[in-house]
């Protein structure tokens, strides 16, 4: 964003001042940050992720607000419509291909019958994805169980409660869980539960995989993070008229896990 402003001739420290504040992965910090930026009489506010955008929306109807990394702006109550936002807010959505991600889980674990959907109960963006995941799981002929947490320190016990109860876990683009993926992946690995996540930035540990979609391609391709050619053979590239799907995964022990 700062680079884009600079390209347009607005350079921090020269003709504009950019004040960056972080909520430090705590949604409860967002309202006070919004107050600070409004009290400074900011000319424009960029809000990253749904909790920040929601906090700013509650505080001002006058200052122009851009948001990004929001799953469903209209569904989260930020705008009247995703096609015509109206009011003082507009921005971009990072909606992930939930149905394709669930299908990926089914491809990796063909015998899967039950899937857990795990997210933080305070994040409306995650609830939207959870509803989509439930529908996708049903369409794949599987059963879903929803497991919510209110803080990352509940993740380990939540995952442990799923051991032996589900065939894999689906985690949407949930800010709380994304920030705590080290804890999540360690617990899932210890319990032997494969985990499908909402975006590639959450893939970095064992038992994690995702699929992401970009436009302007006539062919779907799959990209792997894997140490085994045998594992690579688990997925096949398929074709599409409009989109490119990339699969990011780090599942070095999935074949052993699924047969043990």
Where are these regions (language model features)?
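Short hydrophobic alpha-helices and adjacent helix-cap/hinge residues
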Residues: 1-260
């Amino acid at each position: 964003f700062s680079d884009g402003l600079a390209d347009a001739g607005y350079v921090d420290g020269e003709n504009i001042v950019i004040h960056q504040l972080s909520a430090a992965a705590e949604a409860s910090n967002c309202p006070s940050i919004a107050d600070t930026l409004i009290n400074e009489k900011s000319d424009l506010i960029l809000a990253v992720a749904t909790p920040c955008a929601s906090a700013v929306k509650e505080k001002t109807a006058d200052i122009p607000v851009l948001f990004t990394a929001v799953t469903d702006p209209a569904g989260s109550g930020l705008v009247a419509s995703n096609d015509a936002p109206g009011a003082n807010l507009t921005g971009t959505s990072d909606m992930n291909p939930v149905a394709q991600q669930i299908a990926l889980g089914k491809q990796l674990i063909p015998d899967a019958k039950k899937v857990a959907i795990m997210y933080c109960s305070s994040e409306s963006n995650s609830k939207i994805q959870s509803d989509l995941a439930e529908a996708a799981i049903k369409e794949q002929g599987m059963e879903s169980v929803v497991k919510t947490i209110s803080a990352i320190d509940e993740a380990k016990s939540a995952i442990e409660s799923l051991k032996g109860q589900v065939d894999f876990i689906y985690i949407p683009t949930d800010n709380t869980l994304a920030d705590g993926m080290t804890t999540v992946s360690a617990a899932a690995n210890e319990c032997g539960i494969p985990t499908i996540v909402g975006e590639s930035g959450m893939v970095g540990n064992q038992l994690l995989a995702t699929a992401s979609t970009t436009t302007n391609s006539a062919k779907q391709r799959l990209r792997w993070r894997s140490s085994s050619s045998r594992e690579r053979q688990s997925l096949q590239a398929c074709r599409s008229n409009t989109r490119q799907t990339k699969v990011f995964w780090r599942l070095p022990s999935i074949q052993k896990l699924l047969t043990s």
